[in-house]
Amino acid sequence: MPTVRKLLNEQDFQEALERQLRIRVFEGQHLVDNGTVIIRLDGDTVITQKSVSDITYHSRRDCQFFEVRK
């Protein structure tokens, strides 16, 4: 069963970016992205990529981010 850890601070996000960790993204109560990696981030936005043509922009304020480890 996978282990899930919430990304809470800048250090968590930087680790996920540098180590290319797979994450899940929730907006409200809805899962909007799963199995994606962070390719860029700033204070307001997290940009994720699942495949070559699947790039998504997520608001840090409106979304919750979770690292998924198997």
Across the structure, where does each feature detected by a protein language model lie?
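Conserved RNA-binding domains used in RNP assembly and mRNA/RNA metabolism
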Residues: 2-70
